[in-house]
Design a protein with these regions (language model features):
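Terminal, contiguous helix-loop blocks that mediate binding/assembly
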Residues: 145, 149-151, 165-205, 210-646
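C-terminal motif of bacterial Sec signal peptides marking the signal peptidase cleavage site
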Residues: 4-6
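Bacterial signal peptide processing site
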Residues: 8-11
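N-terminal extension/subdomain marker
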Residues: 13-153, 618
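Residue-level signal for functionally critical sites in structured catalytic/ligand-binding pockets
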Residues: 39-41, 60-74, 163-167, 175-177, ...
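Structural recognition of the beta-strand scaffold that forms the well-ordered cores
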Residues: 28-33, 86-91, 157-161, 201-205, ...
Length: 646
């Protein structure tokens, strides 16, 4: 065998070897992981700690899964890449033996701690703090101060908050805290950062609803970029094998470029889509642009004319909403760009100021993406101007005092309305075949006129089952389509078909007609509906996605709780119904004599087989009517419209 070499080849090999072994710039990644019920109440989700039910260690938990993903990523890296990553995780805040208090661990410790698949029972931790409330400002400040020596050695610095998020109401719910409703408020977050004197290149939130201007307003002095979601997140959150790998493989990228890769990973990679759930949004923000945007919003609020409340209301209601819970009638936030564009159209006298704010907003949003269920999620949200959320939205939460004053005037103006909407019924008839029908986009239906002194918040067609001559069980709704004519709406004829949920075969198994109230349209033209239910006795908002052929293409449930002070705490978890689950829906029931609407629990359906969806004719007495509601909640109903059974 003859080997031929050349000096040039040897030089190339040596150069390549030097390139491969050359040290990479140091990157610090810190994770503040408040385990909460995402870690200690994994399955079954019932409010009881898993280890209490099992009377022993539980290897399940969303935090555990993500720590395992970090370990898996780290073990695939080269020695040079490992040397360049300085990873510190503060984890705890959950009702598990290994997660009580707080433990600080680097990657070497996490690898060692993972050997028995149970985190929190080793002796390798950098620090271990007993009886620590991770939802406190002091706990966060302590971790930030611990990081300071390492931060000084790193060229890129990232901090990730992990847990439930409530936008301007805070992040991180420690389930071992004296109050299980405790979160790190924005004020506490600011205090912790101010006391520690640290600064990050990227501050990220693997938590729901945190891509709000209110959050950005608090953290902008302490980070250059922010990565967060406007909407709720899937229960599994981020896929940390991919997250750490992206940091390691892109050691020379600045945070703006790396942040874009993280956004794309969240929307595109199969591991981030493994639950098949909807409502995925993620955005990268340049925090140096926060102050100019807030200044532009201050100028805008001075130009808004509250004498024209109806267009103001329409601008809000037509905007993309986030963090909705129907029974409490709340939403946390709306998309800021969507609202500004709607406002510009609805109130021309404020259009110049709105355009200036839009220009500033464009500079703030470096990169933003969403799935097809949130077509108008553009990267940054702001308080929704929902009157039921206003008691929790004060100066500590607001982006500025002028904005808070604007929000207060908006809520006050709409809340003083005492007049009900008026629904014109000249096109109604109690017999379907005698109705005066019109058409809209090729569909036959009713053309209605609905008016209100301060504007309509929502107008919908409501479908009902007649329990008797007095009570109507509302099983669903569709939004009424506004026509070009002033105050005119269109409603299609209902043929009496509706959703059917069955335990296995719909011909032989137990079944029920679930309530499904229209929520939104996807970019594919699919309809999303929501309802309230108990899934395995836990309160959830239940979502359905239906295609144009009325087939259910996806379903998911988001657990929530209501705190003692009235906060609706929406979980990051998204659940799917399966065999073995029990499901019990809440129906809105209308008392036609008392003319009141109340919520009542329906029958419980326990699935012995795989749940099956159908869309079929209802073999019961049924009717529909039209409903209009203003901002204050004053509601008008049309006459009841009988559906004739074929």
């Amino acid at each position: 065998v003859l080997f031929l070499t050349s000096c040039h080849a040897a030089e190339s090999v040596n150069a390549l070897s030097e390139s491969v072994s050359a040290p990479l710039p140091k990157t610090l990644i810190a994770v503040y992981m408040v385990g909460g019920n995402l870690e200690d109440d994994a399955k079954p989700r019932n409010g009881i700690p898993d280890e209490q039910e099992m009377e022993g260690p539980s290897l399940k938990g969303a935090g555990t899964d993500d720590l395992k993903e970090m370990v898996a990523a780290y073990q695939t890296l080269s020695s040079v890449q490992k040397e360049a990553l300085d990873i510190h995780v503060a984890f705890g805040g959950a009702r598990k033996a290994g997660w009580k208090g707080t433990k600080y661990a680097d990657m070497a410790c996490l690898v060692q701690d993972s050997q028995d698949q149970y985190f929190g029972n080793d002796h390798c931790y950098q620090q271990q703090i007993e009886n620590n409330n991770m939802s406190s400002s002091e706990s966060l400040a302590a971790f930030l101060k611990f990081l300071k020596p390492s931060l000084s050695q790193a060229e890129r610095k990232a901090l990730i908050f992990w847990d439930h998020g409530l936008s301007y109401l805070g992040v991180g719910q420690d389930s071992t805290a004296p109050s299980s409703d405790d979160f790190i408020t924005l004020t506490e977050m600011k205090s912790a950062f101010s006391a520690s004197g640290v600064h990050f290149d990227l501050m990220a939130f693997d938590a729901c609803l945190m891509a709000s201007l209110e959050v950005a307003r608090v953290i902008y002095p302490y980070a250059r970029y922010m990565l967060a979601s406007e909407e709720l997140e899937p229960g599994h959150g981020w896929y940390y094998t991919d997250v750490l790998t992206l940091f390691a493989q892109n050691a020379h990228l600045d945070m703006a470029a790396l942040g874009k890769k993280l956004v794309d990973s969240y929307l595109d990679t199969p591991q981030h889509n493994r639950s098949k759930n909807k409502y995925k949004t993620l955005s990268l923000l340049d925090l140096e642009q926060v102050s100019p945007l807030i200044a532009a919003l201050t100028g805008l609020t001075a130009q808004i004319n509250f004498q024209k409340f109806e267009p103001l209301l329409q601008a809000v209601e037509n905007s993309q909403h986030f963090g909705k819970e129907p029974q409490s009638d709340i939403s946390y936030s709306i998309d800021l760009k969507d609202w500004l564009q709607n406002l510009k159209q609805k109130q021309p006298e404020a259009s110049v100021a709105a355009e200036q704010a839009l220009s500033r907003l464009q500079s703030l949003v470096v990169y933003a993406r969403h799935d097809d269920s949130k077509p108008n999620a553009n990267g940054v949200s702001i308080y929704s101007l929902n009157k039921n959320m206003k008691p929790q939205y004060g100066l500590e939460q607001a982006v500025s005092e002028p904005w808070l004053n604007f929000a207060g005037t908006f809520v006050s103006t709409g809340s003083h309305d005492q007049e009900k909407p008026v629904i014109s019924t000249e096109n109604f008839s109690l017999q379907q075949n005698a109705a005066k029908l019109c058409s809209y986009q090729g569909r036959q239906g009713h053309c209605l006129k609905i008016q209100d002194n301060l504007g309509i918040r929502e107008a919908e067609q409501v479908f009902a089952l007649k329990a008797d001559s007095r009570y109507l069980f509302l099983i669903g709704s569709e939004v009424l389509h506004p026509l070009e004519q002033n105050s005119q709406y269109f409603a299609p004829v209902w043929n009496g078909e509706w959703l059917l949920l069955c335990d296995g075969n719909c011909q032989t198994g137990l079944s029920l007609f679930p309530p499904a109230y229209f929520e939104a349209l996807t970019t594919q033209g699919h309809r999303i509906y929501s309802s309230e239910a108990l899934l395995n006795d836990e309160k959830v908002v239940f979502y359905l996605e239906m295609d144009a052929n009325n087939r259910v293409v996806s379903q998911w449930a988001i657990p929530y709780s209501v705190s003692q002070d009235g906060r609706v705490i929406l979980s990051r978890t998204q659940l799917n119904i399966a065999a073995g689950d029990s499901l019990q829906f809440f129906y809105q029931v209308y008392d036609t004599q008392a003319q009141v609407l109340v919520w009542k629990k329906g029958s419980q359906l326990r699935f012995g087989q795989t749940p099956v969806w159908d869309f079929a004719q209802i073999n019961a007495s049924k009717a529909y009517f039209f409903q209009a509601q203003d901002y204050q909640g004053n509601t008008s109903l049309s006459p009841l419209y009988e559906v004739q059974t074929n």
